[in-house]
Every structure is written in structure tokens, then in C-alpha cells.
């Protein structure tokens, strides 16, 4: 959900899209498609997502595409793709929302994204096949 509960975002891994749903009307109001030059459509599989607290920017993990899509959460337009590790899956914002950490299951690491700059700043090696990640609120 967006923080104001106006939209529910649902990823469709096999369908390759994110559906935008109006929870009050229980209808799909839009779909976000992802197109990365040089990659087959079936390699682009949206899975984990996160939306900033201000509701302006969304990040979508694209699985075997090894990318995180940056999406304008107001217009639903994809603004850029960030190259991360192999098989990006889940993500979590740090409590101060300065960073977004994403798990890369096949490369056994976590990519650190600077949220304001919208760029990958670090890769941290972790245990084998990481999939989930979370932070406790302070």
C-alpha cells in the first residue's frame, strides 16, 4: 500500500508487471511495465517492492534481470534501472530511509542503494542465497 492507502501495488513475477489497485473500488487502475534493452521479457520478473514514506518514489526488484527499477510513484513511470547483484529479490529501507538494501540471491550479497541519489553505493557479501531482509523500527 501507499502510505495514504490510496493505492495497493501488486507485483506479478511471471506476468512481468506491477498492478496498481484502487482498494476502495477494488479495481485495477493501471499497470507498470518494465523494458530493459538487451534483456528477454521473461527475464524481467518484478518481485519485492518499496515505496518511500513521502509516497513519491518506488523501487521494484526485477529478479533475474539483476536490476532495481526506480518508479515515479505518482505517474507510475519508470525513471531508471539500477544494476545490482544476481537475482535481486527483496528489499528494506533503513529506518532513516537514507538507504535501501536489496538481497541478491545468486551472487550471495546485498546491494546498498542511496535513496536520494538513486544509485548503488556498496555491495556487501553475506551468507549463501539471501532472499529476505528487514529492519526494526527504532
Region spans (language model):
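Predominantly soluble domains enriched in secretory-pathway, periplasmic, or organellar proteins
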Residues: 1-138
